[in-house]
Amino acid sequence: MSVLVITGTGTEVGKTVTTAAVAAVAVAAGRSVAVLKPAQTGVRPDERGDADEVARLAGAVTTLELARYPEPLAPATAARRAGLPPVGPHEVAEAAAKLAVEHDLVLVEGAGGLLVRFDDADGTLADAARLLDAPVLVVASAGLGTLNTTELTARELRRREIGFAGVVIGSWPESPDLASRCNLADLPAVAGAGLLGAIPAGAGAHSPVGFRAGAPGWLAPRLGGTWDADTFASAFVP
C-alpha cells in the first residue's frame, strides 16, 4: 500500500499546493493517484475545497473528502459547533486503505498541523498515519520561526515511531530574506531529515499546464522530481 500523509507545521504553509505538486509529478509518471482530505473546514458546501484545488492543478486524480465544516476552525471544534459528526483516525485510515486498493499512490492531506484534533476523543492525523503505517511529509514555511515548529513536529513523529519522509518548503519567496536563506541548511539539521523540495510562492496561481510543467523542478527525486537541495541552496548563500 503506497500512502503518503502530508501535514504542515501550521496553517497556511502550503500543504495543498505541495500535495498538488506531488500528485502532478506522480500523474505525469503514469501513476494513478487519489487525494484524500479527511476534514475540510472553512468552506461552504457550494465552494471548492482543497481536494478540488489539487485536482485542478494536478490533473487526473481521484478526490475524496470525508467531511466538511463551514467555520475555519480545527476539525473537532468545527464539527462540534456545526452539530455535525466528526471524522476519526480510524475512518481516515479505512478510507485511505480502500483508495490504495485501486490507486498507485494515495495522498492524505491533513488540516493544520500534525496534532490538530479531528474529534473529541483527541484523534489526530498522527494517529491516522500510525494506523496506516504510512510516512509523513512535513510542509514548512521558509522564514523566521519555522525551525522551532519543524523540530517539534519531527520530534513528535519520532516519539510516535511514525515514518518521516522529509520536509518541503511550501512557499519559497521570490526574494528570500536572511532567515529564509539560512533555513535551507538549518531546516534539515533540526528536522533530522532531508529537504525534499521548495515550492515557489504563488505557484498555486499558475495555470494547470504551467503548474504541471514546473512541479518536477520543485521536488526532489524521492518525490519523483528533479530538484536538488545542494544546487538550490548554492543560489541563496546567506
UniProtKB/Swiss-Prot annotation:
Q: Which GO terms describe its molecular function?
A: ATP binding; dethiobiotin synthase activity; magnesium ion binding
A GO BP term here is: biotin biosynthetic process
Catalysis: reaction(s)? (7R,8S)-7,8-diammoniononanoate + CO2 + ATP = (4R,5S)-dethiobiotin + ADP + phosphate + 3 H(+)
Q: Which residues form the active site?
A: 37
Report if keyword Metal-binding is assigned: yes
Task: Name the pathway it acts in.
Answer: Cofactor biosynthesis; biotin biosynthesis; biotin from 7,8-diaminononanoate: step 1/2
Q: Which residues bind ATP?
A: 12-17, 50, 109-112, 170-171, 200-202
Q: Which Gene3D superfamilies match?
A: P-loop containing nucleotide triphosphate hydrolases
Q: Name one GO cellular component term.
A: cytosol
State whether it acts alone or in a complex, and with which partners, per the record: Homodimer.
Report what the protein is called: ATP-dependent dethiobiotin synthetase BioD
Protein species of origin? Streptomyces avermitilis (strain ATCC 31267 / DSM 46492 / JCM 5070 / NBRC 14893 / NCIMB 12804 / NRRL 8165 / MA-4680)
